[in-house]
Amino acid sequence: NVVDGLLENDRYGNFVPSMAEDWSVSKDGLTYTYTIRKDAKWYTSEGEEYAAVKAQDFVTGLKYAADKKSDALYLVQESIKGLDAYVKGEIKDFSQVGIKALDDQTIQYTLNKPESFWNSKTTMGVMAPVNEEFLNSKGDDFAKGTDPSSILYNGPFLLKSIVAKSSVEFAKNPNYWDKDNVHIDKVKLSFWDGQDTNKPTEAFKDGSFTMARLFPTSASYTETEKAFKDNIVYTQQDSTTYLVG
């Protein structure tokens, strides 16, 4: 993950602190208040410190998503007070939307109605923070898919390179606030065109991949299952099966 939101899920699906070190909910279930950790920083793609992560970054991030009509906006558009009206142009002032930076470390959301699952939405990209100064400096080049330097990073990994139809490479952020719990130094995702279903498995067998998608319909599935039965992770039917080394 290159950009962290307020909360994240642990391996059991429980919500745990990320950029928010603590949070509270009003008795009526309409107001969620999060305290931003003071040791959270923004970094460039080269790992240089850019700025502290502040509550206002979450306001900027949501406004950016709304102004750009993000495809994921539907997740929160009718949840946050005033957001739907802003997106539809019924109000022009974003300060009327139910998101407020009370100070540098405190961000507050006001909902239209109680949502017991609201915290799950804070893990979504549409709720991610954006540094306003950096956003303005990049203009239309902000978050340009092929350019690692077009975004800032507050997460455990930095995007190092992205080559269309080839690979995407990440490196551990050495300054990440929780770096001691990040145990992988580099990640490389290799492109696969979906044609030869045996290709990912073969790459796993020869050590090129540490994880590969496994297709039960592939010609080599039975052989692979026998050889790597302890490495196969099965998921739900609407998900994917992987070999993990």
What are the language-model segments listed below?
Residues 1, 19-20, 44-49, 118-129, ...:
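A structural "hinge/loop" feature
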Residues 1-27, 152:
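N-terminal lobe/hinge region of extracytoplasmic solute-binding protein
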Residues 21-74, 108, 203:
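Aromatic- and charge-enriched surface segment that lines or borders ligand/interaction sites
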Residues 35, 56-57, 64-134:
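Surface-exposed binding/hinge segments that line
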Residues 92-95, 105, 110-182, 186:
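Gly/Pro-rich hinge or "lid" segments in bacterial periplasmic/extracellular proteins
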Residues 142-148, 174-223:
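Ligand-site clamp/hinge motif
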Residues 171-175, 193, 240-245:
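A bilobed periplasmic-binding-protein/Venus flytrap-type ligand-binding module shared by bacterial periplasmic
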Residues 213-245:
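Local pocket/hinge segments that shape ligand/substrate recognition
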